[in-house]
């Protein structure tokens, strides 16, 4: 979910200062839009989040190094942004009717893959799945 938000922020913010209220507004607006557009055909929203410490980094030390370099060259305060995103994630989990999934050591992609595999391999269960992601992989 954070990658979707970050993708939207990069398009919307341009040179505006980072604002917790703006980020929250964008997240809630996006979720409302997805629910309105897709809930009839795809059911409820399940929000998947990356854990801060991914298992891939243990095996591939240079995993996401390009991202780290790009962030260091950016004027955006990435620590502040991730703090805001974590706060909003907690608010969603505590105050909204969405299923919020975050698993120690896993990325959202891992969670999505396991859920998709489980649904597609369950006998007599056919369910359309829509995945919305800001990831490029």
Task: Tell me the role of every PLM-derived stretch.
Residues 1-132:
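Noncatalytic, basic helical substrate-engagement surface that gates or grips nucleic-acid strands
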């Amino acid at each position: 979910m954070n990658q979707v938000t970050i993708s939207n922020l990069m398009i919307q913010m341009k040179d505006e200062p980072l604002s917790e209220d703006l980020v929250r507004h964008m997240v809630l607006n996006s979720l409302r839009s997805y629910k309105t557009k897709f809930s009839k055909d795809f059911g409820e929203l399940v929000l998947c989040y990356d854990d801060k410490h991914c298992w891939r980094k243990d095996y591939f030390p240079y995993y996401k190094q390009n991202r780290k370099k790009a962030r260091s060259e950016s004027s955006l305060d990435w620590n502040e942004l991730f703090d805001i995103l974590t706060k909003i994630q907690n608010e969603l989990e505590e105050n909204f009717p969405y299923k919020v999934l975050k698993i120690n050591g896993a990325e959202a992609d891992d969670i999505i893959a396991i859920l998709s595999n489980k649904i597609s391999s369950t006998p007599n269960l056919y369910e359309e799945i829509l995945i919305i992601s800001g990831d490029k992989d």
